[in-house]
Amino acid sequence: MWKAALLLSILAASRADAFCGFFVGKADAQLFNKASQVAIVRDGPHTVITMGNDYSGPLTEFALVVPVPSVLQKDQIHLGDKKLLDRLAEYSAPRLVEYTDPDPCNLRPAREEMAMSAARAGTPAAAPEGKAAKAAGVTVEASYTVGEYDIVLLSAKDSGGLEEYLRESGYRIPRRAAEALAPYVKQNMKFFVARVNLKEAHGVQQLRPIQMAFDSERFMLPIRLGMANADAGAQDLIVYAMTRKGRVESTNYQTVKIPGDVEIPEFVQKDFGGFYKSAFAHALHAHENRAVVTEYVWNMGFCDPCAAPPLTQGELTALGVFWLDNAGYHGGGMPLTLTRLHVRYDSEHFPEDLLFQATGDQQPFQARYVLQHPFRGDLSCAEGKQYTAQVVARRRAEAMTLAQLTGWSPASIAERMGPDAPPAPPPFWKGIWR
């Protein structure tokens, strides 16, 4: 690019206002780029991107500016379906799975251990150019109407002139716009500017995602523009990267896997979203808020467990996956790996654009968390006493794991566990003098 078990899933980015360009608003419009979703299909230099668009303000005040590697032809631009991004989000979302212990009184110890091990292994039960443009050193290279969008491709001699042109076109540019635009002008990149065609948008309930297809040796996402109009704090970006080769990682920032595949207390089921937000923030803090977090890596032909059904071949083609043949991939692998990357970025911790590479690593990974419910029936058998002690030890371990994942205090966890909280260990001095 420019260069069975119950499954509960969450979408880590609750809104997806735009791609990592910036919104520019006319007059006093307050438009903020809070969170983004983007799907990237990449094979060699061939790149297709789908930029999520959940903008909900006045259509007259919408505009999107994105740096692109070259002047795009009209047939390189397409409007996608937001449902496809929703499908990717659901399919790759962090997930909570639950299992229930078997009756210890009806199983021999060897069979019991076999069943517990199998459960933990993860097998589930189921603008025209004018004088202003020329004076500012801006050239309108191309202009198109695509669906509900009017699109212009701009080139600029300097970032100040580009900012001036956009302002004189009636848009209120963020204060740091020229500074943010400058690196792309120096790289001789072009600027894709989309705004709403009110006539074509009549009756449109929601603006559709914009898709672009192009060749570029650079595999990257330009996030610096997205910081120019951030109101405060960091912004979230979810990247769904699809390649023929394997897992995608950042080459200029550390890429880490979110800690997971562990057992956590049962009460988390009531607020899995709140838990995951804390776990994600805690993981970032451990890496000084400078890491790109991997939340999912899997072959798109199957999943285990599945938070949602895998995307169909037709859906993948609509997202730009162009190398799949007509062969069916029912329950087996296909030449396509999905990587879900979550970035929380600001200018202090992410001063550069995101650079990526596709690796040959196809090892599956998912942000998976396990609830192991105890057996709650009659435990009057001889094995029942031993099993009860095992459950107490397991709950203590689950509470410790939760504290490590989230940074929550042991006391607050014990309070939320209620009667399931393991008893506090005796003071150390109890065993000294007998």
Predicted stretch roles:
Residues M1-L7:
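Sec-dependent signal peptide recognition
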Residues G21-L31, I173-T401, L405, S409-E415, ...:
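Accessory, solvent-exposed terminal regions and/or long lumenal/extracellular loops of proteins
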Residues V48-T50, E148-S155:
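Short hydrophobic-aromatic micro-motifs
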Residues N53-Y55, V68, S155-D158, L198, ...:
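A mature extracytoplasmic/lumenal domain signature
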Residues H78-V146:
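A cross-kingdom signal targeting lumenal/periplasmic-facing segments of multi-pass membrane
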